Amino acid sequence: MEEEINSHLSADRIQSMLRTDRWTIHYRESVDSTNNWARQEAEEGAPDGSVYLADTQTAGKGSRGRSWGSPEGTSISMSLVLRPEIEMSRISMITLVMGLGAADGIRDVTGIDTGIKWPNDVVCRGKKLCGILTEMGPNGDYLVPGIGINVNMDRFSRDLSDKATSVFLE
């Protein structure tokens, strides 16, 4: 059965558009956190290149223990399972590479001028557009970088309105 994403895309369709077979797409309509889902799958042996997407996160994670809100239809929430063969001292580069890729992708697709706010945010006009959180397995045998991109948010709470933005608002 094909997994629908926002009634327009499906996991199978995304998979077919990729130029490589390295990535395997998995989709659920709602999860507590794509990072939690990916970590659970990694612990059960998910291979390098497994991608976990959800339309809604009920308990998305941000850096420093903060929550990341992603109500239905408002964001891209995605986590990967990576099993890289790199030195521990270079693992922090994964977050930077994810951020650069997101910033470039957003700019290429939308024309929005984006930048990186070290170490894990993509910003537009000084406001956060995207956040990245990379977690490591307990034995260091896998990484789970997660990314949340604010896409269709039309407003933010008063305490976030001067700090956050979305593709829609830009």
Report the location of each language-model feature.
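N-terminal lobe of the biotin/lipoate ligase/transferase fold
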Residues: M1-D108
